[in-house]
Amino acid sequence: MFSFVDSRLLLLIAATVLLTRGEGEEDIQTGSCVQDGLTYNDKDVWKPEPCQICVCDSGNILCDEVICEDTSDCPNAEIPFGECCPICPDVDASPVYPESAGVEGPKGDTGPRGDRGLPGPPGRDGIPGQPGLPGPPGPPGPPGLGGNFAPQMSYGYDEKSAGVAVPGPMGPAGPRGLPGPPGAPGPQGFQGPPGEPGEPGASGPMGPRGPAGPPGKNGDDGEAGKPGRPGQRGPPGPQGARGLPGTAGLPGMKGHRGFSGLDGAKGQPGPAGPKGEPGSPGENGAPGQMGPRGLPGERGRPGPSGPAGARGNDGAPGAAGPPGPTGPAGPPGFPGAAGAKGETGPQGARGSEGPQGSRGEPGPPGPAGAAGPAGNPGADGQPGAKGATGAPGIAGAPGFPGARGPSGPQGPSGAPGPKGNSGEPGAPGNKGDTGAKGEPGPAGVQGPPGPAGEEGKRGARGEPGPAGLPGPAGERGAPGSRGFPGADGIAGPKGPPGERGSPGAVGPKGSPGEAGRPGEAGLPGAKGLTGSPGSPGPDGKTGPPGPAGQDGRPGPAGPPGARGQAGVMGFPGPKGAAGEPGKPGERGAPGPPGAVGAAGKDGEAGAQGPPGPTGPAGERGEQGPAGAPGFQGLPGPAGPPGEAGKPGEQGVPGNAGAPGPAGARGERGFPGERGVQGPPGPQGPRGANGAPGNDGAKGDAGAPGAPGNEGPPGLEGMPGERGAAGLPGAKGDRGDPGPKGADGAPGKDGLRGLTGPIGPPGPAGAPGDKGEAGPPGPAGPTGARGAPGDRGEPGPPGPAGFAGPPGADGQPGAKGETGDAGAKGDAGPPGPAGPTGAPGPAGZVGAPGPKGARGSAGPPGATGFPGAAGRVGPPGPSGNIGLPGPPGPAGKZGSKGPRGETGPAGRPGEPGPAGPPGPPGEKGSPGADGPIGAPGTPGPQGIAGQRGVVGLPGQRGERGFPGLPGPSGEPGKQGPSGASGERGPPGPMGPPGLAGPPGEAGREGAPGAEGAPGRDGAAGPKGDRGETGPAGPPGAPGAPGAPGPVGPAGKNGDRGETGPAGPAGPPGPAGARGPAGPQGPRGDKGETGEQGDRGMKGHRGFSGLQGPPGPPGAPGEQGPSGASGPAGPRGPPGSAGAAGKDGLNGLPGPIGPPGPRGRTGEVGPVGPPGPPGPPGPPGPPSGGFDLSFLPQPPQEKAHDGGRYYRADDANVMRDRDLEVDTTLKSLSQQIENIRSPEGTRKNPARTCRDLKMCHGDWKSGEYWIDPNQGCNLDAIKVYCNMETGETCVYPTQATIAQKNWYLSKNPKEKKHVWFGETMSDGFQFEYGGEGSNPADVAIQLTFLRLMSTEATQNVTYHCKNSVAYMDHDTGNLKKALLLQGANEIEIRAEGNSRFTYGVTEDGCTSHTGAWGKTVIEYKTTKTSRLPIIDLAPMDVGAPDQEFGIDIGPVCFL
């Protein structure tokens, strides 16, 4: 049963499902189908083509191939027009029975000649003729272009010649040649299709009559006839067996208030309590007397260095330092704007031979050649005029049978044929009409009892039958089902008080009581002895930085620093405008710190600067060495109270102090957690009888007996609910004094004393904890990428995708099996009634038939596929009907047919003599109620019923008297005393700790207010049976209850003893039996008549009203537990639970307010490339999401007693509403994250372009992306250029050291050498930053390429005596590097422009002995080519040739 809250969830899900509904549904009539623009109704069958057959099944088109029968044994099979399967033209469609074939008729005349067939298809083309001779040469073309254009055309020119000859344009076409001679005639065409068939011949004479057919199938059994009228009423049966025990008595009255229970046994001493927590530090003690002045201490060790002062003013400029060494080459810059076009260079040397040019245009036709040999025959010409008729040729071979012609006109009827032989037996005919009823036959011999038939359909209600003989007494019926509980009776008078029961056994030990309230604070204890000095406290927090000192003198210039390593290549910035001439270069990176100079003189103190903002806390530094102790300073002014320190570890227990006076009683503590269930108590005395078992199935009711005497009153009802707890008993004796308690917490601090004189120097303290970190230093360089974290727990299952598009139609299924035979037809109308037959002898009793109602017909099966089309028989003309043949010989006697349909019921016969009583049959299903019979005479008084079941529990008793006070418990063991806490200011109130085990019992409290009733307790173990109490007075009869549902059958009870016979009822008058009139209105109740004769047994009456409860029966066996009662009223709210486990990390909070403005940054790298081009084609559709991760509402179990409805309990609803609201909030947050990703590891974006679109104001930087979506564990960290939307992936190792990587055995032989493939220490370049998984990056790059339209990458080649691109000596690009793309394509410096890279700086053109660099840039729309994975220089191999590589990030847009 859904609640409305669940339906809200469903609505949410349904709303999202609706999004996925297709929109292509057409409004076609329900169940019809459309194919090729034609509409078919449901169950229509059609053939879209000859060999396919289709059926429309409730809107679905099912098609199947027509399966043809094998015609391999038919030499001249034909396929009729519009059909699929071949048929034998000379096979008659009707079957021939070999034993009586008819005589063959004479052959018909040959039909007239058919029309001439259509011309055959044209023959294949002949082989083409030889080409014609070339035409004459054309006139010369105009002059070619000037020499300046030569380099553009230089596919190949001679190195020795200075210029180049360029062919002119093509001349005009020559004149058309003469037509060629005619070709030879073509080969003979294929044979045309056969002509139409001739008319059919006249039909042959009719064959002889076939022999008689086999006997037809036996007809189906007829339906059962209507039942006869009911017989007359039989005489009354003997008295029925003793009735079942009456239903349970009404609930007893409310019991008297119970006596107070005996005092409980004295409890065991409680376990020792846990060691107490150290007390909170006391307040300062009263000031001590001033001590004598101490000796001056030794000079302390230097203190730790103070925090950095504020930045001083700039010093005067120092003297210029010596120039540092040349720094390493910076990362490659981004491509500059194209320079102005240079002047034409000197003509280069002749290049190597270029590739073969594309095929030229065809030349002008040559002169006509000599005539070629005769060509193959040409295509057939038009048919010539018809020639004269030739002489008849030899008869040709018979042609293939032509296509079947249309049926000829029907020929004249033939003469009647001779009389045929007897035909085959015909198929069984349809059932004839019912014949007239025959005369009744003589009674047959009594047959043996037939087998049990199936149970017929239930007949219509019969008329009353004649009275039967009295039947034998039935077996005692099973107990009837228990009725519904009656309405509450009027409360009976109060019973006499029961005897006081013997005291019960001691119950199990109770669960520990709630902890007592904490006692009030005790009086302050006597002042303790002065404690030994505490260990030194932790260092205080660093104070605010002091005022800035005056500027120091400029220090001497440091020595030049060592050369730093080259930095990682930066991302491409946007292209900047051309700048003005640059300022002098920036100062070099600072060198390592020089030796410490001599300290300058202190400047005078400046004015106090304002305190700087607190820097973020740095990570904790390592423990420094302890400093020398400083001089003892004067005490400073009291600082603000520090934050509470972490609790110290537990100290060693102190000596036991003198016991303090008992404190006043504290406030009540939090209730402890529920204790462990105690061991079960000893078995109690046997309890009272359990509730009666479920009633057995209801037996057939006996004839009603006369009402019995009123039974003795029912048992007193079960005791009422437990009364409220009695008032607390009197206070118990005071317990023995406990052992000495732990020392009290130190008293509150006294007022502060006067400052004493400085004491003697103390021993050096233990080194204090390191102080808090100073303000943060300048940001360090970016660290190396960390190792990948452990794989997180798998995320929740991803949302299921939207429903996919419907699949294509499946292959047509195989041909369906033949459908089931249809349901049997209805029985025909009954014939007229025959005369009454003589009564037959009584049959033997048949064996009882198996029970079972006749099943109804099943629903019709689904539409089968259409069967294959049958062969088309050629229609013959129908002959005249032959004379009837002589009757065939009589067939063999058929086997006995199945039983015919039951004839119509005859008039009721005279009653036959009574047969012997049959064995009792199985209990039939109950028939419909007959008309109510006349009331029977009252039977003899029934035996008194068994004593009724114990009544329901009475009302709750009144509150009991207070119990006696229990004896005082033994004092618990002394707990260990807590360690003395360090003295400090009181900490903030901590959260309540977990409840400790129960302490010893407190003194008796004042009586509390009466609590609300608690929840029902769990059922206790079954007690022993109690003694029977005295009978109470009878209760007033209750109103009859509604009948209850039939329970499962209980065990039969033991038969009760026979009760005393009751007095006979007053006699009634005997009424004459009148005909049954229509039911009149209910009359007033008549007076009791005189005793009549004993009447015949009446029909079964309707169930009477519930009688008054009978006397109590003997106790039944323990019944099963009853169904759970309805839930009680909601109890008071429970105590606060223990603190839950820490929740999961919350979702990231909203972005905080912008921080303060940072310092001006250093000059940034060169800007990114220019604005993006026009938008690319739309990307692939994004994956949908679904809501399968919604939490399913928990399935509520129904109580045994009936369904539990959600709205029955408002608190449940509130909780579930809260749960739904929380789910919806979480869901909307998740959907928001899907729609607007944040680029974090937990919520990665798909590409930087997505981030730019969702968060256009975010800054460029590193973000996480997950192009393949799904689980975010394989997300990768990239740089997002937020101005362009580019996604840039760094290489794993961006810098390849500058050194000699390759020594060639033959340095003069120059060839390209791949760095990763061939060089011994080389490697192919990988991407994704340090610590990333290469497999994850490879997959993500594949998706990134698919979603991008353009990719760019720069590579810087650092060279020493190695040419990278242009060779200065030769002026060509032969020694230029090769690059290998991600799809293993080679990218070159020259050649096809799609596979060539460019350079933005070329400093590696010659061997100068100095380091230079060339910056290569490759930009492509074929994103699969990037990133670059290998590089091959050519100009390497000599010992003085060195190189290094900086690999830039690959950026996708």
Curated annotation (Swiss-Prot):
- The keyword Disulfide bond is assigned to this record: yes
Describe how it is modified after translation. Contains mostly 4-hydroxyproline. Proline residues at the third position of the tripeptide repeating unit (G-X-Y) are 4-hydroxylated in some or all of the chains.
- Location in the cell: Secreted, Extracellular space, Extracellular matrix
Q: Site: Not glycosylated. Where? A: K1022, K1085
Start and end residues of each Fibrillar collagen NC1 domain:
1218-1453
This protein's GO CC annotations: collagen type I trimer; collagen-containing extracellular matrix; cytoplasm; extracellular space
Q: Where is the region Disordered?
A: 98-1203
SUPFAM superfamilies noted in UniProt? FnI-like domain
Residue positions, PTM 3-hydroxyproline: P874, P1153, P1168, P1171, P1174
Q: Where is the composition biased (Basic and acidic residues)?
A: 106-116, 1082-1096
The record's disulfide annotation reads C1248-C1280, C1288-C1451, C1359-C1404
User: What InterPro entries does the record tag this protein with?
Assistant: Collagen (IPR008160), Collagen_superfamily (IPR050149), Fib_collagen_C (IPR000885), VWF_dom (IPR001007)
Positions bearing Pyrrolidone carboxylic acid: Q152
Q: Glycosylated at which positions?
A: K254, K1097, N1354
**Propeptide residue intervals:** 23-151, 1208-1453
Can you quote the domain comment?
Answer: The C-terminal propeptide, also known as COLFI domain, have crucial roles in tissue growth and repair by controlling both the intracellular assembly of procollagen molecules and the extracellular assembly of collagen fibrils. It binds a calcium ion which is essential for its function.
Q: Its family?
A: Belongs to the fibrillar collagen family.
Functionally, this protein is described as follows:
Type I collagen is a member of group I collagen (fibrillar forming collagen).
Name of protein: Collagen alpha-1(I) chain
Organism whose genome encodes this protein:
Gallus gallus (Chicken)
Which taxonomic lineage is given here?
A: Eukaryota, Metazoa, Chordata, Craniata, Vertebrata
Q: Gene symbol?
A: COL1A1
